[in-house]
């Protein structure tokens, strides 16, 4: 398995994908920070850092994060079809399951620094604004970890779509539609988002709730993410 991962990691266009991820994060962060500071004067003391977190993560997790994951999944998979290397690998009895798992691990390592950068932006913005954290920093780190976990069902879903269509644009288009449907579900009945794959990063980051999950919410979150990841990984 190690050899599969190293082979995939070596040929991954890491700089290109990181630049894309940082660009998406920068754009969503500007929106969130702009809204926060525009309404800074009307915020109640003791809630500022939570509102900052909510604004900073909401537009990222709902609007741009799923398409970003679709782009990463697409750029990891589509070149294999264009070069027709999959047929050659199958002929040489290379394990497609291990190959795909190597790509999933590569995507995780690409997403990790982007999400850590999101946490850093939050910390720096809070320091600039001169506010203290309403919750411990460890809590926000935990929410970042949950957002990483919730990335897997989207990546596996987007990989499934990309493999079936062999088309980069269609995969990104589906993720964009998924992001818009997430907004619709929020306004119709937010409870539906608990079972919608494109809503999972928002739930993991607690962008709307702004408080820790209860035990039952955590179990449901883990179950939904495992089920979706397993279904589309197959």
Name each model feature, range by range.
Residues 1-25:
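Aromatic- and glycine-rich beta-strand/loop motifs that create alpha-glucan
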Residues 1-10, 77-90, 144, 148-169:
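Cytoplasmic juxtamembrane interface segments
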Residues 20-26, 165-183:
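Pore- or pathway-lining transmembrane helices of multi-pass membrane proteins that form conduits
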Residues 24-69, 101-166, 205-220:
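Secretory targeting signals
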Residues 34-53, 172-234:
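Terminal transmembrane helical anchor/hairpin motif
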Residues 69-73, 121, 157-158, 197, ...:
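Hydrophobic/aromatic residues in alpha-helical transmembrane segments
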Residues 76-108:
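Helix-loop-helix units of permease transmembrane domains in multi-pass membrane transporters
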